[in-house]
Curated annotation (Swiss-Prot):
Protein's UniProt keywords contain Iron-sulfur: no
Glycosylation sites: 62, 165
Recorded GO MF terms: carbohydrate binding; heparin binding
Keyword Repeat set for record: yes
Disulphide linkage map: none
Name of the protein in question: Protein eva-1 homolog C
Lineage: Eukaryota, Metazoa, Chordata, Craniata, Vertebrata
Length: 441
């Protein structure tokens, strides 16, 4: 025997969804997915450009590293760049590699310095992307302080593979110039002469050096003189760069530099922003030759890239604010587009209504009058063909009418007056003829 269970409630009928409603809901979902895709793509582009900004920062900064005796000194630069050694020191320092400093060796720390350190590091690491150098006293020549703890300190830059190079002979003027919003950054400079380079600044009475005589202190001189400026000039002589070669040897200065955007260089070295802009020079100085037929507007190379990098760096630092501004701008754009569509539709509707109202105000008799006038004009044109030919043949300056033509003209005028009178009667106006109608009689 079956016991009666709890009565089941009938299923509630679900409202039938109209297909038109579904079409109205789908576009916002598509817009939302499109917005998500745009945000993902923009975030990838932002991270890529921020990495590029970090890459430029690594190229502009001075890197310093050290290693103690028995260790390896590792120098590394990013892709598409090489090592440019700025300075090197090998000697004693008990604070770096030793916890205790014996009292008997306090005065020896000043004399325990290897003079060949810089040249050795140049030979091993210059223009290399990576360098691994074993720190040992035998690598840098005779040990001046046997038994003491020493270390190697190297300062270097990562110079891009594509840089500007300039060579100026002795007793000539070096001129460096960057365009607006860019500043000079000196990567390397040498003053002297190499034995293999015979074609640079050569002359018949020149005395060639028996060995390479180069002064690397030219880098410090040019950095103090030209770093962070748009224009720089200096006379290449022994007074500024010393005399590394024997008397009678013709020397030259070789400079490797780059023009860096202001925003990036200022972010690395804030002191650049406090520098006063250089005074305007006369035409022809610093290698600037203005063409009268050309544009006098200064070039803006690199401004777009530098401003974009600064903008993306700000967006990466403030993602919430950037997202809020982006969503707000999208909403404002959609609102303006909607307003434009509404105004366009309403104006089009008003124009159609106005046109229909004008068509209703025009009476049907006017159309009849226009048709009759068109027919009369056609008749006049057809009838006036032959008289026109006669008048052209006889060369008369006044019209000639016969009795038949006068009768037809009077009949046409009378018929026109009847049509006009009928039009006035249909429109409910006064049926009396105007005064000027009597002039036709």
């Amino acid at each position: 025997m079956l016991l009666p269970g709890p009565a089941r409630q009938p299923p509630t009928p679900q409202p039938v969804q109209h297909p038109g409603l579904r079409r109205q809901v789908e576009p916002p979902g598509q817009l939302l997915r499109l917005f998500y895709c745009t945000v993902l793509v923009c975030s990838k582009e932002i991270s890529a450009l921020t990495d590029f900004s970090g890459y430029l920062t690594k190229l502009l900064q001075n890197h310093t590293t050290y290693a103690c005796d028995g260790d390896y000194l590792n120098l590394q630069c990013p892709r598409h760049s090489t090592i440019s050694v700025q300075s090197a020191f090998y000697g004693q320092d008990y604070q770096m590699c030793s916890s205790q400093k014996p009292a008997s060796q306090r005065e020896d720390s000043l004399t325990c310095v290897a003079a060949t350190t810089f040249q050795k590091v140049l030979d091993e690491c210059q223009n290399q992307r990576a360098c691994h150098l074993l720190v040992n006293s035998r690598v840098f020549g005779p040990d001046l302080c046997p038994g003491s703890s020493k270390y190697l300190l190297v300062s270097f830059k990562c110079q891009p593979n594509e840089l500007k190079n300039k060579t100026v002979c002795e007793d000539q003027e070096l001129k460096l110039h960057c365009h607006e919003s860019k500043f000079l950054n000196i990567y390397s400079a040498t003053y002297g002469r190499r034995t293999q380079e015979r074609d640079i600044c050569s002359s018949e009475a020149e005395r060639l050096p028996p060995f390479d005589c180069l002064s690397y202190s030219a880098l410090q001189v040019l950095s103090r003189r030209c770093y962070g400026k748009q224009r720089c000039k200096i006379i290449v002589n022994n007074h500024h760069f010393g005399s590394p070669c024997l008397p009678g040897v013709k020397k030259y200065l070789t400079v490797t530099y780059a023009c860096v955007p202001k925003n990036i260089l200022t972010a690395i070295d804030p002191a650049i922003a406090n520098l006063k802009p250089s005074l305007k020079q006369k035409d022809g100085e610093y290698g600037i030759n203005f063409d009268p037929s050309g544009s006098k507007v200064p070039r803006k190379d690199g401004i777009l890239v530098s401003n974009s990098l600064a903008a993306f760096a700000y967006i990466r630092a403030h993602p919430e604010r950037a997202a809020l501004l982006f969503v707000s701008s999208v909403c404002i754009g959609l609102a303006l587009t909607l307003c434009a569509l509404v105004i366009r539709e309403s104006c089009a509707k008003d124009f159609r209504d106005l046109q229909l109202g004008r068509e209703q105000l025009v009476p049907g008799s006017d159309k009849v009058e226009e048709d009759s006038e068109d027919e009369e004009e056609e008749e006049d044109s057809s009838e006036s063909d032959f008289p026109g030919e006669l008048s052209g043949f006889c060369r008369t300056s006044y019209p000639v009418y016969s009795s038949i033509e006068a009768a037809e003209l009077a009949e046409r005028i009378e018929r026109r007056e009847q049509i006009i009178q009928e039009i006035w009667m249909n429109s409910g106006l006064d049926t009396s003829l105007p005064r000027n109608m009597g002039q036709f009689y």
